[in-house]
Regions:
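Short acidic/glycine-enriched loop/turn segments that link adjacent beta-strands
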Residues: 35, 119, 231-233
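A structural micro-motif at secondary-structure boundaries
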Residues: 132-140
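A structural micro-motif
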Residues: 27, 60, 129, 175-176, ...
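Residue-level signal for inorganic ion chemistry
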Residues: 14, 18, 42, 53, ...
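Short loop/edge segments at beta-strand edges and connector loops
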Residues: 64-66, 135, 182
Length: 254
C-alpha cells in the first residue's frame, strides 16, 4: 500500500469519528492556553489518524496539533496532522471543517489529503500525479488579471499586528470580488479553479499547511509564504493561479 492509499485510509478513519461527533453534538468545548477551542472530538480524530499511520509506517514521525510529535526527531518521513481544521466552525455547527493529513519527505510536502465530510468533499494529491476532488481531476483557473480575480482573504487582526493591514486592504480594491471562506477551504477552492486567490491569516503552524501544498501544486496553482518564498513552515500561506501569484505577493509586500 502506497503513501496516498494510507493517507486516504487515515482520512476514512478520521471522518468516521469527526462526522459522528459533529452530528451528535454531545461534546464539551474547552479552551487551550492560546484561547483557541478544542473538543474531545479533535483528540479522538487525531488518535484515529495516528493509529492508521503508525500501523502502516511505524518508523515515520507524526506531528499533530493535539498531541505534538511522535517518533524520531531525525525521521526523513514526517506526517503533519490537523485533525479538525476549523474547530470554531465545528463547535458552532458550521460544516466548513476538515482533517488535514500531509506527508513531508526530506523537508518537502509530497502527499496531501484534505477531507471535509460535512461538505461531502475530499481533495488529495501526491507528487507527480494530478490533484483530485472526490475522484475528479482538478486544475487551477486561468484568470490572467487581478481586476477579474475572485479572492478569499482572511482579513484578521494578525495582518494588522504584522503591519500589513493596509497592504491587504489595498489588495481587496484590486480584485473583482472578495470573500472569506477561511481555513483549508479557500485554498482547495483555488486548486479547483473556483477561486483565483486565497490568503490565510498570519499565525498558522506547519500542520495547517503541509497537506495543502501538494494539492495546490498538483492542481497547477502557485503557493508561498506572505513574502513569496516557497516556505511551508512560515506563518501563513498564499495561493493563486500561476498568472496572478506574483502580482498578489507584490501587493502584499508593497
Amino acid at each position: 500500500m502506497n503513501d496516498l492509499d494510507v493517507a486516504l485510509r487515515a482520512a476514512d478513519a478520521a471522518d468516521a469519528v469527526s462526522l459522528a461527533g459533529f452530528t451528535e453534538r454531545s461534546f464539551v468545548v474547552e479552551h487551550k492556553a492560546d484561547a483557541s477551542e478544542v473538543t474531545a472530538i479533535d483528540r479522538a480524530t487525531e488518535e484515529a489518524i495516528t493509529a492508521v499511520l503508525r500501523t502502516a509506517f511505524p518508523d515515520d514521525a507524526i506531528v499533530g496539533e493535539e498531541f505534538g510529535r511522535i517518533g524520531p526527531a531525525t525521521a526523513r518521513r514526517e506526517w503533519y496532522v490537523d485533525p479538525i481544521d476549523g474547530t470554531s466552525n465545528f463547535v458552532r455547527g458550521v460544516p466548513v471543517w476538515g482533517s488535514l493529513i500531509g506527508l513531508v519527505v526530506d523537508g518537502m510536502p509530497v502527499t496531501g489529503v484534505v477531507s471535509a465530510p460535512a461538505l461531502g468533499r475530499r481533495w488529495w494529491a501526491t507528487h507527480g500525479a494530478p490533484a483530485h476532488l472526490n475522484g475528479r481531476v482538478i486544475r487551477a483557473s486561468d484568470t490572467a488579471s487581478l481586476d477579474r480575480a475572485f479572492a478569499s482573504i482572511s482579513v484578521t487582526q494578525s495582518w494588522r499586528d504584522a503591519g500589513r493591514g493596509p497592504a491587504l486592504e489595498s489588495l481587496t480594491r484590486h480584485v473583482a470580488r472578495v470573500r472569506n471562506y477561511g481555513d483549508f477551504w479557500q485554498h482547495m477552492l483555488v486548486a479547483e479553479g473556483a477561486l483565483d486567490v486565497s490568503i490565510d491569516a498570519i499565525g498558522l503552524k506547519p500542520y495547517d499547511i503541509a497537506a495543502l501544498v501538494p494539492i495546490v501544486a498538483a492542481a497547477g496553482a502557485a503557493w508561498s509564504d506572505r513574502f513569496g518564498a516557497p516556505q511551508w513552515r512560515g506563518d501563513t500561506i498564499v495561493c493563486a493561479n500561476p498568472h496572478l501569484h506574483a502580482a498578489v505577493i507584490a501587493q502584499l509586500t508593497a
